[in-house]
Structure formats: C-alpha cells, structure tokens
C-alpha cells in the first residue's frame, strides 16, 4: 500500500505520535462500505483488515472496539467518489468532505439551521462567492459536531464557525471555550471541499493521497 508519491503507508503509520494528525485522501465507492477504513486502520494497528473491529458509540459515531479504542482515534467522511480518513492519538478528530456543487437554497438552509452570524456573513457575499463559502462552512460545522461525537442532532445553531474568505476558526460553542478548539480547511482537490476539527492544542496535519482504492 503506497501513496501517490511512492511512500510506504506502513512506514508513515509507524510515525504517528501525539503531535500530528494523519489525513488520508482516497478514491471510494459506496459499495465498499467500511472496508477501506478497516484496511487503513489495520495498517496502524498491525492487524489484517478482517481483524479490525468497529462499533458505533451511543451517538452512532464509529470507533475501534476495546482495547484498540484507547490507542487510536479516527474519523472519516466520503462524498462523490472520494473519502477522507483522519487518524490521531489522544484526541477525537472530526472530518468532513463534500463535493462542490451549487445549492440553490443555501441561504434558506443557513437561516433555518445556522448561527445568525454565519447567515449574516453568507448574505454579505456575492452569489459566486457564497456557493463555495456555504460548502466550506458546512464541512467546518460537520467536522466540529463529529469531533464532539454528537452529529447534527447537537444543533448547528449552538456554535459559530468563521465564513470564508476568513480563515477557518471556531468562534463560539455553547457550553465550551471555543479557543480550546482547532479547525482547518483541507485541500481535497478541485471538485471537493473539506474540513478537520478537534478539541485540544494545535497539532501539525500530515496529508497524503493513496495511490489506489483500498
């Protein structure tokens, strides 16, 4: 298993420590279900994919079964032929990827579900800027709720994320100190936008593309 630059994935996985988050971009088909995820996690754990056991927590978030869940944390997302997998130690990452497309009712969705400051920032943009900004904002909010382990049911209006062209940042979170959080926009190619979030100190992000689908 290698990256598009020819690096050995097992060698990269062996270098994961508490200062970095590994992010993997790969081709994906829905019929594969969780098999690519298990294959990659197996490289980190030194296990064959069929020995990697995943379970869903009380909010439906996938995690490794004990005892592996104490050693390795991950999150993943897929959209329109691409998947992103974030792997870390000691923190719970949240990641989201979305295909770039025009959403005609973007402002209506924002007004109904988003924080008022986010809606105001989107409204201030011209239409061409708004389309991409909405999708980047959406992935940022998805990444945060996934890092919270709660999903959209947490309430998208209960926190506020910066709107592009401003740098990605969690500005406010109900019941928590937003400054304790990290939020980053990721480069997922011309056809997708993506974001990564976690609660905790800043870490470096190392991102690779797999040379072939798992």
What would you call each of these model-derived segments?
Residues 1-214:
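Core catalytic alpha/beta fold that binds nucleotide/phospho-ligands
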């Amino acid at each position: 298993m290698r990256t598009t630059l020819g690096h050995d994935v097992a060698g990269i996985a062996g270098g994961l420590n508490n200062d970095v988050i590994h992010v993997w971009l790969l081709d994906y088909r829905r019929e594969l279900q969780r098999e690519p995820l298990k294959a990659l996690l197996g490289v980190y754990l030194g296990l064959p994919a069929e020995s990697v056991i995943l379970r869903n927590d009380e909010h439906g978030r996938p995690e490794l079964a004990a005892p592996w869940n104490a050693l390795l944390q991950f999150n993943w997302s897929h959209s329109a032929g691409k998947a992103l997998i974030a792997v870390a130690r000691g923190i719970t990452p949240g990641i989201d990827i979305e295909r770039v497309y025009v959403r005609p009712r973007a402002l209506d969705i924002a007004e109904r579900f988003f924080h008022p400051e986010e809606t105001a920032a989107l409204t201030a943009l011209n239409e061409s800027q708004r389309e991409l900004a909405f999708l980047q904002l959406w992935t940022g909010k998805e990444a945060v709720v996934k890092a919270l382990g709660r999903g959209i049911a947490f309430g998208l209006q209960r926190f506020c994320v910066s709107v592009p062209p401003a740098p990605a940042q969690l500005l406010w979170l109900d019941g928590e100190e937003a400054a304790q959080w990290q939020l980053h926009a990721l480069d997922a190619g011309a056809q997708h936008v993506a974001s990564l979030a976690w609660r905790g100190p800043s870490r470096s992000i190392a991102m690779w593309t797999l040379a072939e689908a798992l």
